[in-house]
Amino acid sequence: MRIPLSWLKEYIDLNLEPVEIAKILTMAGLEVDGYEEIGKGFSGVIVGDVLEVEKHPNADKLLIALVSDGKEIHQVVCGASNCRKGLKTAFAPVGASLIDEGKEFKIKKGKLRGIESNGMLCSAKELQISNEDDGIMELSEHLQAGTALNTLYSDTIFEISLTPNLGHCASIVGVARELSAATSHPLRYPHLVFKEEGNLINNSLTLDIEAKEACSRYTCRVIKNVKVGASPDWLKAKIEKSGLRSVNNIVDVTNYVLLEMGHPLHAFDYDLVKGKKIVVRMAQEGEIFETLDGKERILKDSHLVIADSEKPIAIAGVMGGRNSEVSEKTTNIILESAFFDPIFVRKTSKQLGLQTDASKRFERGTDPNQLISVLNRAAMLIQMVAGGIIEDSILDEQTKDFLELTIRCRLSRINQILGTTLSRGEVETIFQSLGFHYQWDGQDSFMVCVPTYRTDVKEEIDLIEEVARIYGYDHIPRNGGRYQTSKLPDAPIYLFEKEIQSYLIAEGLQEFITCDLIGPTLVNVVQNLSMPAEAIVKVLNPTSIEQSILRTSLLPGLLQVVKYNLDHQNHQINGFEIGRIHFKDGDQYQEQSVVGILLSGFSQPYHFEEKKREYDFYDLKGIIENLLKELGIEKPQFKNLDLKTFHSGRQASLFVDELEVGSFGEVHPSIQRRLDVSQRILFGEFNLHDLMQVATKLEKVKPLAIYPGSERDWTFTIKTSVPFAEIIKAIHEQKSDLLENVLLLDIYRSEKLTVGHQNMTLRFIYRDFSKTIAQEVVENEHQRLKTAVSQKFANDLKQ
């Protein structure tokens, strides 16, 4: 938002340097991005009166103009297409100075294509007044030739960024009000002096609010016999300094009042409004409407429109229509000032992809009790710059009352929160400076009436924030109030999540955070995630189709992470995410906390002596087994449940004490192809509540062995359909304390073996921690285990 200092000074007396004003506003919560001084990029530039124009004899695109400075006539060669007889424009005579790319240069006599030129006719951009460069400046015909241009355009412009809660500051008056509160300088409001005459407005126009929920107040005036044309210089200068383009005197007045008082207005051509009736209604589904920017919009029945007796003439709070636009032919106008619900305006603006200065202000909230004063201010200015007859009275339909909110604010609470010792009088002064009426209860509380333009103040803590702003954050003592933290212990699941997080970070994994919302595109990529279609939870009012479904797994979001990074040439992607998944179980909506682990890329950094190896199933399995060991889970079981998400032979589901905790594996190649990803993706997902339930955290620390152990190998043939985990489980069920460990040494598959069989070699390590183990004892124990396992798999195992 651009705020000209000269305009600001019309409402508050400020004898401060721009840097001081910027600091005051910043400390009050308005973010001043900076300020610039305009009109100082030139000197000696004056108003020139173009007396004659003829074509250049030696150049098709050049003109020869005779320009008066009020005393003498100068011949100037100009290339602007809008140079014409009778135009008042910016004239830099010989000796004037301009600045180009930071360097000053003086205007000198010269020749262009053989014709002498004594000066330069300037655009606003060349004078660094604005960025408009569509021709030389067109000044008011009422200006005297020879008038110094810097008296009209020199100014300081503040660039202010407003947060959404500061809608009441989105105007010149709003910023002046903040400065008044911070400096105690009195605020002057705009004058309202005009004359009503002519017919009673009820004889010229009727008003009907059908959509009462979306529009709770609508006011309008009729002004007849206006003369639409160019705006006077003072009006045009203020509009352009504030970053808007001058259109005509009627439109410029509505923009002027928007900038000045912060409330959007709109003017309709009265003679183009059918039935002389204004109807505030919802659009019809599929209704087509051409907005002022020349684009046709397809409306929905959730869009609020202003209509006449036949058709829409404006999208309420967003933009007017071509079919009622004020033009040079307009002689009678309807001037609108209304209060539209911020939610309706925001939805309409987003759905149509159409954001305007008006919609931004309506979305932040405007003051419904300001409508009449805003309307009258605009009517007064229109009468001043365009003439016309303001018809008697105002059409004003209101569907509800807008009362000031009364909030109890305790003095003790103010000092407790801020760590201050403010007196009652100091707080009263602050409330008065803010324009808040109040009553003191004689003990500790103020009953504060909040003006309706302060939509951001809703409860006591908001009033305390206002006190802090005006008192000054830099005046609040650093040793503020002391507070005791909650004595309630953290939730066990939260502590468990933190433990998992710390371990996985220590493993060298990055933490990812993805969105809970996904779209059909990702769902189609992943297809079946062990979750039926009826379990998917859809969002009723999604902001976009790609955020219309709550995720049933962390995989879709993490696949997006892989795709994005590979597209940006980042091939090493190892990380995890702790988040929530959502699904529907019958009529109940369920939410679960899960951890997802993802590996993609190479297991070791590049080395010239070693061949690069991609992450595989066993890399992921190793991380998971280490995590389980960290959690004290000693006997995990892995089963292949043939989940469609994973490669059929490179997956496993994790069971602990018959409880399925999660699954992991290599993401199915078909998913990789749909993502257009060439490198392997490993993924695992585990239910945190289930993991916490089976975690014991009772780590058994074994001392280093002081007695030697003994090893035995066993090679046997077994069906490939028997999971290795089942064999290990059978051994552990029969083992004694002498068996320290069992390792898989080798798996051999060959056409020479019986179809569907493989050779497997296991190494058994025996040790007695109290003495040297006898070989006879080892042999007996080894034979016992071999016999037990052989009997267990009698139909599947051959020795």
Curated annotation (Swiss-Prot):
Cofactor comment text: Binds 2 magnesium ions per tetramer.
EC numbers, comma separated: 6.1.1.20
PROSITE patterns listed in its UniProt record: B5, FDX_ACB, TRBD
Compartments it resides in: Cytoplasm
Catalytic activity: tRNA(Phe) + L-phenylalanine + ATP = L-phenylalanyl-tRNA(Phe) + AMP + diphosphate + H(+)
Binding site for Mg(2+): 456, 462, 465-466
Keyword rRNA processing in record: no
Residues covered by the tRNA-binding domain: 39-150
Listed NCBIfam families: pheT_bact, YtpR
Quaternary structure (record): Tetramer of two alpha and two beta subunits.
Name the UniProt record assigns to this protein: Phenylalanine--tRNA ligase beta subunit
Organism: Protochlamydia amoebophila (strain UWE25)
